[in-house]
Regions:
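Cytochrome P450 core scaffold surrounding the K-helix E-X-X-R motif
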Residues: 40-45
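Nucleotide donor/acceptor-binding cores
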Residues: 1, 26, 175-176
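Glycine-rich beta-strand-centered segment in the early N-terminal region that forms part
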Residues: 18-35, 46-96, 101, 123-124, ...
Length: 196
């Protein structure tokens, strides 16, 4: 398959890489239809984070399930899904407490995992044609079939939930005024989340 591969600071290339495979019964393979470029990807691209050459970027992904592992219970081939940026198991102590960004199962030697990001586990990113998603019942959010609202739904992978979480942590209540400093994509979603 084709994928965006990091070479060195300020250099990426579209290259042929190995197709992902089902490695565990709870995996799915997703044909990627959208993958956003995050500021975190730019940290690696610009050399501000020590990324190893060969990493495939992309932790804001959505697509259609092409293949399914034998233990997957809530998803089917053909389901349109978006994957949150962090990889989590859903059953460890941290996941059970809602701290999925600090999952202790998905990344040997470090709490927390993400697709296509340095030191965040073995998970290949989604700036590619296909992607393996582990613990798929937990890591795939099913969407309506079709291709309507593709750009809108892609925000569910990282940008919108990050902004929403900020508004939630601020304990915003109806009628309150809110100031957002740094109104880039995530800041705009925090402002929007304060309205809803």
């Amino acid at each position: 398959m084709k994928a965006v591969v990091y070479k060195k600071p300020f250099e990426v290339a579209v290259e042929t890489v190995d197709d992902p495979k089902i490695k565990h019964p709870n995996d799915v393979i997703v044909k990627i239809t959208s993958s956003c470029i995050c500021g975190s990807d730019l940290h690696m691209y610009e050399g501000r984070t020590a990324a190893e050459p060969g990493i495939v970027f992309g932790h804001e992904n959505m697509g259609v399930i092409e293949e399914i592992g034998s233990a997957v219970k809530t998803l089917s081939v053909g389901d349109r899904v978006v994957m949150p940026f962090n990889v989590a198991c859903g059953f460890c102590k941290n996941c059970q407490r809602g701290y999925t960004g600090f999952c202790t199962t998905v990344n040997p030697g470090f709490a927390g995992g993400a697709y296509g990001y340095v030191a965040m586990g073995p998970w290949v990113g989604g700036q590619a044609e296909y992607m393996q998603v582990p613990f798929a019942d937990f890591n795939c959010l099913p969407l309506p079939k079709g291709d309507q609202f593709e750009a809108d739904f892609s925000l569910l992978a990282d940008i919108f939930p990050t902004g929403y979480h900020g508004a939630e942590l601020a304990d915003v209540s109806p009628g309150e005024s809110v100031a957002v400093f740094g109104a880039g994509p995530v800041g705009l979603m925090a402002a929007y989340s304060s309205v809803i």
